[in-house]
């Protein structure tokens, strides 16, 4: 197995473990989120979900598109955005880090506009995935 495939497999495994063990707490945190980007360690990448994914998506290169996850254990699609671990260092220079743990980071951001978030969510979940 080459290095790229090995890295991808490791990232996928870490995301799978994260969602298997922490999905409810992640979604609960995102349900009430309005001004923080919650990032979770996934190997070479950090991943954000739902509102955190929206805020992260606004900050990063537009070629990095969010991924819509359809999980058997959750009735609705979940939006995930990722950022390479090296680019998180740039975020540290531009945004206030509220929490730093081994596998979790939280950055403060400007408060999100609910209408803009809903439009973004519909674009990625409904229009592009045709659910």
What are these regions (language model features)?
Residues 2-131:
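Basic, polar low-complexity surface loops/patches
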